[in-house]
């Protein structure tokens, strides 16, 4: 009650924030005549002056009115588009590191130019993050005209660029790209061997377009760079054959709500007989059990044309939120291979993680982060808790005129689809354009078939027909046009109403099913009613829809029976709509917990990742690695000598053991013969340093490259192994809950112990390698490439194989081709030697 009164008297927090910005908007408007008097050639000069002022210490906030006024005038001259006052407010919210919630058609792309130009003045780069390559290229080319007019450079990061092109794009004042490309470039940079090979130059300021899609919808899927593991793919086919013989409810049960499939006791016994083992849960059969469960999930929880499609002999994931294909992405943990076996296509080898990061932790690296979307308010709590981002609702330039009708709920899907087809036919006959939103490819193709039978012309936009996405969406507002689109395909493209459509009521949105997230439903509705245009929306539901079936449809079903509903007759009741909304809230809460749990676990990995990546950067950029090597040596010797330094004289066995470790780790017998007495720690230290000094003398200027090569090689090998061990720990840690232990705390504790052990193994490994080197030939070029450590050879033992490389789409290099490293020599005499 008090909160309500406070809000009534003082306005909401959002209102108060916008009110504070009004004087700044007035100041920008007051500068308009001054900016109008500038010649075109004066604009880059002004920007150069502002850059100089920033270098001299002037704050961006103080320059905001002038810069915003300059950008507004540039927009008028380049695009004949003047930023509205509400767009200036949106630009300020972004500059302040907030999420600007702006309705569809309010010009988010143009709004972003204001804070982008202001923050580009620092010279540290601004990243504009979009959901797909098409939007990145479109916005970079479109808004690039304005930036170039102002004398600022623009780069764009899309799939398929080489490192040189990426480095040039990141070197620009403003860089457009997708969240995946930015994240993967960060991971790839931390697998490079030389500082000059790095493409990114830090994380200063990012504006994330469709921020809800990127920071929430995609946050459940971490970015992973992986290399092929050694496991055979034959087991997947065998397990697939077994699962096909199982009967639901007899051999296994499925919980669709929790998305789990479990074998019954009868099923376990049946599988043991088919596989030919005594105990499926014996530790020796853990691989068989794992593959069997993945095959069970593939057959019962993942549906073709809903969760994935089969295209050109490959299983391609369908994004559950946008309905777009995600080529190159694969389900982890053997699930993708299980789907390949199910669909009888070629099974690719299972991958091993080489580097990974979640979007949450990647975007939290930016010094300042901001976002734009049409729908963020329902997720405001999550944005605040995880990213410390505040959502600001920006007023529309013109009042919203869209009418949102109550949901029409039917008993069965058949009744619902019949009603939808009839409604579309009636609207089409009247000439009113319709955008039909579906959750799956399956539904969109079913409706398309029904409309063909009734003779209603229409366009279909889903993951199978996405080539003309922007063109199809742009035409969706034309008179009599019917467009069927999965989810939010086509976001980012405005639907402009055709001639005479306003008089017919504008664009009608027809939702065929409620999504588990209210925000996705709101996004669909938001395609209509842009810039004060008329419009309408209605969702058609049935008790057989997944959301209704899994979350409380019994109450609604009982209510419909009491009301005496006839077949084909819908119910429109606020009570039912509220029940559906509550179901959505429960699902949203569940998904938030999943994302939060993922973040809790990744935070443990994130701290470790930061340590490893800092070590790598230091190794790449340090002019002299001598002090680091001496520090490593002191740590190694402290551990080696620990058994012999307990106070009492060490036994003969202890002395022998210490000598053995000195020989193994430091190759000390190269300069010192074992004796009944141990050398002092200082003597051992001097002996090892003498070996390194000899190496320095023999290799000259290449010494630093040799040290760096082996340090990075060992670091990468141990980190890759550690990631695999952490994956295994994570897989089994949930069982600790049965022993009254907190799985997260256990993961943190054990993960830290494993990390400490790994750091020590790195130090040991570096000395084990370096003290065994003998010089054969020294060519500096040999150390410029991780693949060719040809300048040195081991005097004892064998070199371990380098880490598996991530799958790349690069063409294979022939033995007689020029080497891609740029040396000018043939591949067979250079990196292919």
From Swiss-Prot:
> GO cellular component terms?
cell envelope Sec protein transport complex; cytosol; plasma membrane
EC number(s) given by UniProt: 7.4.2.8
Task: Region Disordered: list its residue ranges.
Answer: 789-816
Catalytically driven reaction(s): ATP + H2O + cellular proteinSide 1 = ADP + phosphate + cellular proteinSide 2
Give binding positions for Zn(2+): 819, 821, 830-831
Which metal ions or organic cofactors does this protein require, according to UniProt?
Answer: Zn(2+)
> Which keywords fit this entry according to its UniProt record?
ATP-binding, Cell inner membrane, Cell membrane, Cytoplasm, Membrane, Metal-binding, Nucleotide-binding, Protein transport, Translocase, Translocation, Transport, Zinc
- Residues annotated as binding ATP are 87, 105-109, 494
Cofactor-binding details, from the entry: May bind 1 zinc ion per subunit.
Q: Which terms does the UniProt entry file under GO BP?
A: intracellular protein transmembrane transport; protein import; protein targeting; protein transport by the Sec complex
The record's subcellular locations are:
Cell inner membrane; Cytoplasm
- Membrane topology of the entry: Peripheral membrane protein
Locations of Basic and acidic residues compositional bias?
806-815
UniProt entry tagged with the keyword Transmembrane helix: no
Enzyme class, top EC level, equals: translocase
Report the SMART domains cross-referenced here: SecA_DEAD (SM00957), SecA_PP_bind (SM00958)
Q: Indicate the family of this protein.
A: Belongs to the SecA family.
Q: How does it assemble?
A: Monomer and homodimer. Part of the essential Sec protein translocation apparatus which comprises SecA, SecYEG and auxiliary proteins SecDF-YajC and YidC.
Q: What is this protein called?
A: Protein translocase subunit SecA
| Gene source species | Nitratidesulfovibrio vulgaris (strain DP4)
